[in-house]
Structure formats: C-alpha cells, structure tokens
Amino acid sequence: MSSTWGWLYVSMHQYGGLPSWLAALAVLLLAMALSVYFAMAGGAWVTLYRKWFLHARQHEGRYATHAKSFLLRSEVNLGLAGAVMFAALWTLAELARGQWFTGFPWGAAGYAHGNSLLAVYAPWVGVYGMGAIAALVAMGAPLMVSVMLSRRTRAGWVLLAAGVLLLFVLPALLVRFVPSFTAPAGTMSVRLLQGNIPQDEKFIPGTGVQTALTWYAEQLLANPEPLVVTPETAIPVLLQQLPAAYWQSLNDKYAGRTANQGAQNTESGNPQLALIGLPMGGANVGYSNSVLALGSGALKYRYDKQHLVPFGEFVPPFFQWFVRMMNIPLGDFGQQRTYASVLSWQGQRLLPQICYEDLFGEEVAQYFALENQAPTVLVNMSNLAWFGNTTAPAQHTAISQLRALEFQRPVIRATNTGLTALINHKGEVTKSLPTFTRGVLVGEFEGRTGLTPYAQWTSQWGLWPLCLLCGAIVLFLGAFFRRSRS
C-alpha cells in the first residue's frame, strides 16, 4: 500500500517543505489507515470461514457412510465457498476505500490486470469487478492446493477447472463471440500541449508564470488543428489577472476573427476549439479549478472540477494544523456540484476531466445515462508535476486506460510533465510524448458511440449493485457456515 502512495512523499517533502522523516511517516500512516479496510476483510474471512473449514475437517468422519458423489460435492463447495466469500469481502473493502472520506481508490486490484486476460471483463463489471475476479482466483488457488493435499484429488481438479474456465476459457469466448458494444463516430485531429513547467516555479511571477503564459499562448495561436487541449492550470493565474490583449487574441483566434478586421477568418477553413485549464473565480464568489472552451459562434462552455483533492484543493476538517506545516500554494477551491454537460463539437461529444477525476469511473458513468448524449471521447487535463519523477505518471495513465476499456471510449491526456498521450477505445496507448519534456503531440482519435454493460448499470445505479451483491454473498455464506457448524 505504501508503494501505491509513494509519490506523495515528493509533494510533501520536495514541494511542501516537510522534513523527510515526517513526509515518509505521513505516507506510512496513510497506507496503514487505508490498509484497515483489508485487515477487516481478512479478519472477517477468518472468523466466518476458517472455523467452518476446520469444523468440516474435524468431523469429516461423519461422511464415511455417504456416497463418493456427496464427498466430491462437499469438498468442491468447501473450496468454492471460501474463495467466493473472500472475493466478496475484498470487494466490499475496495468499495469502501474508494468511496468513504472523499475516496482513495488508487491501487485498486483491477488496475493490475488492465493488460491481462482479465481486461476482457472491464466493459462488463469495471475495475472493481475485475478486482473481485482476481481475488476469487487468488484465494481459490491455495484452497485448491489444500483440497489436493488432503487427498481429495478429484475435488481439486474440479476447482482447477473452474479457475481455468474463469481465467482463460470465458475471456476467449467473450473475445471471439461478443462483438464490440460501441461503434465508430468519426475521427478528429487533436493537438495536445505539454509545457513541462517545473512545479516549484509554476506559480512564481516572473519565472514559471511568465514562461507558461508565453509558451502556451504561442502554441494556442499557432494551432492548425480542429482541437487543442492544454494541461490543468496551464494558465496559472486568474482570468481577470491576464492582460486584456492576451485573452482577446486567443478569443479572436478561436472565434474565427482576425484581430484587425473582427470578421470571419477563413485562413484555416475549419472551426477550431481550444480547451484551456486555468483557475476561475474570485474572493467574493470562491475559486474553482476549471476548463474554459474557446470556439467559434455562440460557444460558451466552462467545466469546474467536481471531485477535489484533499489537502491539495481543499482542507479536510481538523487538518488545518497539518496544512500549516507545509508551504505548498494550496488552492482554496470550491467543490462545485452542478452538472456540467458534455461539450458537442464537430460531430464529437467531449467530456473534460481534471486531474484524478477519471479515477472515479462511477462518476464518469453519470454522463452515460442517455446514450444519445453520452461522450464519444474522454479528455483528461492534469498536472502531475507535484509528484516528480515517480510512478505517478504511469499509474495515472493506467487509470485512463482502464476507463477506456470500461466505456470503450478513447481517452486523450494533456499533462504538464507527462504522460501526454492518445489512448484508443481498447485501452492501448497509440501515441505519447516523453515525460518531463516540453512538446506538442499531434494525432488523431476515433470517437465512439454506444454503451457497454458497465456504462449502462453504473449510469443508473452507481456501484450499488456490486455492493449489494457482495453484501448478500457475505450474509448468505455466513449464515450457511453457522448452520453447518451447528
């Protein structure tokens, strides 16, 4: 668990000024706190299952007069029940960790299988369902060995066959006979900007601020593509703090006017759209981490980040003392709960997401409630410079790949330091920039329409079906174990 959160050490020590020992301790304490969910799941499994398992072994003499078919069935049930119980408890622990106290779903077990055979289950059950299947197999394997070592070879082979069916046969059948749930919705060229502004300079006037304003303006004004996307807070100042001529020149460019004529500019021939990350608001109305769209016609679109980062964008209750120990320029952002619709542009429907918002697939699914209004492409705009040269860029790319698999949608990522990339609807990175370099990625994505089973049920009921199913399994098997002991 500590390795999942190791990149927080860089934020707190390198950029927050905490002593190294204190930053390391904070990461360790967070990992310990989040491990409690799984400790409770393991304790519950031992309490409910192990006693029943030992009871069955101690009283196995009572089976002596039963037919061999009964013995086989009882041993198979013994192994399957233990594995299913463990998978249900594990999944409940992951769901609780991912939802409670703003949610900490990094490192969910399903992400480890995004490039494995289990990836075929993503459009059906999502990352938590994949984690449940992985947990089922992980506990089923040692229980199978236990059954075989107890000289119940036939029962062991049955359990092995069940594992092979789940891991190999069923995925192969799904790939072979189940068609894609989505269909092509046309292609579009896109230009993704990666400014590589050092985090310790990003908000410093005269250095990082000036560099960002100059470089991003140059790229936005020179853009020839129909769509251009900047990272999160690429413009590191409030809109009202920008020189009037700066924003006006961008407005003129994407409204299709020349600065001198104020008339339609037909130079490029095609309408253009820019998605720009910047902070919005003011002291009287509050601040938000936002995306503004610039385009032709009467286009007006603004997306405010919905799921804020604890400590980074808002301070949780009772933790002011911890924040005061750091000198990170923390944002006092408001937590907006207004529904922002998808952005329709040139035949595509774009859903902007800021930073780690694409980690919460159940929140992304809310935009898929109506098929004819569902996004055709997911757009992630991030600034992972806070975490330095760690596993954070690769980890967040893997998260985006899983979202692509769950919804069968392309994901385009524009980040400050990487990984800026194009991901297709199969979860494959088709094009990317090297991390920690300044550059521009130009490519093409294919939008998709249609809904996966995962998109259908999560858009209607969230994660409740999975939660209720696992809870019902635990209650049923728990009652069954108690009756068996009596």
Give the role of each language-model region.
Residues 176-461:
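Soluble catalytic domains of enzymes that build or remodel membrane lipids, polysaccharides, and related
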Residues 1-177, 381, 389-390, 430, ...:
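Membrane-embedded alpha-helical bundles of multi-pass enzymes
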